């Protein structure tokens, strides 16, 4: 590719509305342009990267035995009603009607469509297992699209779906997909971890996320210091404290706290250790519980894990917090004065709260708190559950080492769905015994466009993007200085360009009439890994300058050796 025949579209200034570095650099490098909130046009440089990611994903899916299909983005609403997700999915599901008033959705995922397809095509256990994949546009009507293509409304995704008659068969395919995903991200030179995860709205019995480690990541990932345990913080179990509850040493007393409406204010004003305080959080109760609200208690220095809390049978799904008006209508006090003593509601306490003694909490009267609360003496111990997020230093759930926490960007997710969709949609095959059997399913997703942004978050410096070779828009840039004034510079540039192309190398020849500084800045910004600078002065000694974008090192290479040298440097 020649720059004179290419749309480079680089920007010197960082757009004001770009929050994270990947969004900033994708705009500045001329990879994307915003069309509307959460909607982006991919420009030539962006498309080249996107296609390389897509090709690696496709190759490894094929290697793992998956079969490519293509399903419509527009899906009939009745399939979503049949699966039960029409009501469950919420406003992220964009719904519309056609001219005949028939309801449809823009597909955020394709479990319903593939299940409908397979129940009409497969009728015998002898035809299974099968694994189908597609690389296709998805749409989710995000309430607040942000971070560029990291959380866009329209995005490119690889989704795969497998069908089985036994759990053992599903596990084999799940393991194969786990290995394929690992190979995909290894080929892209990404620093990633596969972690245990919650199944979320997709459902199922087991899942792993593939997280690219980056400070800008939205997810907290926990790791053991002494084992291979790794999980999303939403999933990680917080073990019960090993030490028994201490003996009570204080009397229960009620204290005036008119200016302490938060844990931080309570701790500061009364010199109370935060570990001796309890937060009482009110959420809406399940309608079958007989109550409007449920109280959830966590230690003052801990955070409620909403994913864990939502799984409690007495909690309404999805989990929603009560408003101050709702709380006052039942308790007669505001959110800053709540506690477990004399609380006329169901209470669930975290494991760490269950072993506390002599602790402080709201008195369910505005401006008052109880200090010196003790279980079994002042009130019975209520239901105990794991309700909190783990913190650094907690014992690892597998009992080996302690936990560390890092930030991650989710780029892939695999699920063992079981029979959630196949049972709801009556997707059966004839089993070995001649009886109809509900198929067992797995599903496996990779956010192809999100991978591009995640790679940038992990590979950049103050000058721009530093692409891994495998997904760079161009592997080599040829930068001839004043080629329009020097015949021999132009001749070598053209010869090198033709030879590299004949070797299957993605190369860009900068044949613009631009100053050297502009040429260097553009190639560094778009992240070309290998750069060759051809100048008259160096040609006097039959040399060219090679610069590696990642290492930043320059070295002189003989013109007769440059092709072999580049082929040895490029990771293919």
Swiss-Prot record:
Gene3D superfamilies: Anticodon-binding domain, Bira Bifunctional Protein, Domain 2, YbaK/aminoacyl-tRNA synthetase-associated domain. Catalyzes the attachment of proline to tRNA(Pro) in a two-step reaction: proline is first activated by ATP to form Pro-AMP and then transferred to the acceptor end of tRNA(Pro). As ProRS can inadvertently accommodate and process non-cognate amino acids such as alanine and cysteine, to avoid such errors it has two additional distinct editing activities against alanine. One activity is designated as 'pretransfer' editing and involves the tRNA(Pro)-independent hydrolysis of activated Ala-AMP. InterPro entries: aa-tRNA-synt_IIb, aa-tRNA-synth_II, aa-tRNA-synth_II/BPL/LPL, Anticodon-bd, Anticodon-bd_dom_sf, Pro-tRNA-ligase_IIa, Pro-tRNA-synth_IIa_bac-type, Pro-tRNA-Synthase_IIa_type1. It catalyses: tRNA(Pro) + L-proline + ATP = L-prolyl-tRNA(Pro) + AMP + diphosphate. One of its GO terms (biological process) is prolyl-tRNA aminoacylation. This is Proline--tRNA ligase. Its EC number is 6.1.1.15.
């Amino acid at each position: 590719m020649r720059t004179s025949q290419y749309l480079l579209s680089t920007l010197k200034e960082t757009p004001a509305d770009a929050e994270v570095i990947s969004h900033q650099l994708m705009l500045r490098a001329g990879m994307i342009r915003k069309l509307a909130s959460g909607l982006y046009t991919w420009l030539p440089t962006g498309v080249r990267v996107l296609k390389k990611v897509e090709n690696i994903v496709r190759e490894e899916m094929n290697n793992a035995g998956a079969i490519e299909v293509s399903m419509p983005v527009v899906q009939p609403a009745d399939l979503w009603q049949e699966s039960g997700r029409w009501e469950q999915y919420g406003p992220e599901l964009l719904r519309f009607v056609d001219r005949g008033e028939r309801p449809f959705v823009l597909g955020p995922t394709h479990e319903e469509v593939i299940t409908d397809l397979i129940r009409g095509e497969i009728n015998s256990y002898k035809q299974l297992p099968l694994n189908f994949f597609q690389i296709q546009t998805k749409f989710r009507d995000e309430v607040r699209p942000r971070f560029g293509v990291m959380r866009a409304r329209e995005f490119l995704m690889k989704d795969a779906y497998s069908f089985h008659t036994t759990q053992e068969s599903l596990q084999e395919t799940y393991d194969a997909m786990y290995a394929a995903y690992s190979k995909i991200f290894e080929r892209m030179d990404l620093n990633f971890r596969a972690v245990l995860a919650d199944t979320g709205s997709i459902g199922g019995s087991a899942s792993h996320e593939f997280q690219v480690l980056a400070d800008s990541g939205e997810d907290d990932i926990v790791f053991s210091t002494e084992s291979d345990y790794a999980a999303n913080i939403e999933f990680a179990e917080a073990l019960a404290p090993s030490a028994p509850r201490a003996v009570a040493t204080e009397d229960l007393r009620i204290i005036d706290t008119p200016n302490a409406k938060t844990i931080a204010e309570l701790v500061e004003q009364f010199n109370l250790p935060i570990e001796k305080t309890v937060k009482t959080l009110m959420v809406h109760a399940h309608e079958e519980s007989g109550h409007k609200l449920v109280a959830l208690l966590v230690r003052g220095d801990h955070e409620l894990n909403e994913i864990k809390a939502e799984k409690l049978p007495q909690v309404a799904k999805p989990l929603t917090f009560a408003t101050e008006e709702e709380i006052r209508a039942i308790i007669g006090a505001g959110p800053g004065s709540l506690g477990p003593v004399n609380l006329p509601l169901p209470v669930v306490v975290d494991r760490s709260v269950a072993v506390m003694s002599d602790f402080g909490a709201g008195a369910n009267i505005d401006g008052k708190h109880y200090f010196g609360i003790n279980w079994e003496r002042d009130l019975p111990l209520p239901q105990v559950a794991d309700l909190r997020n783990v913190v650094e230093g907690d014992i690892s759930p597998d009992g080996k080492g302690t936990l560390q926490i890092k930030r991650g960007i989710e780029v892939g997710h695999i699920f063992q769905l079981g029979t959630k969709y196949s049972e709801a949609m009556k997707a059966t095959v004839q089993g070995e015994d001649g009886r109809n059997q509900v198929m067992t399913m797995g599903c496996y997703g990779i956010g192809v466009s999100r991978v591009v942004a995640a790679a940038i978050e992990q590979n950049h410096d103050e000058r721009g993007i530093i692409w891994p070779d495998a997904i760079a828009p161009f592997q080599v840039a040829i930068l001839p200085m004043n080629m329009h004034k020097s015949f021999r510079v132009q001749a070598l540039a053209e010869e090198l360009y033709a030879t590299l192309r004949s070797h299957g190398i993605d190369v860009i020849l900068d044949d613009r009439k631009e100053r050297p500084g502009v040429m260097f800045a553009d190639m560094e910004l778009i992240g070309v890994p290998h750069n060759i600078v051809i100048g008259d002065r160096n040609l006097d000694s039959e040399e060219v300058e090679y610069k590696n974008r990642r290492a930043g090192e320059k070295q002189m290479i003989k013109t007769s050796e440059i092709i072999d040298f580049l082929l040895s440097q490029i990771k293919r």
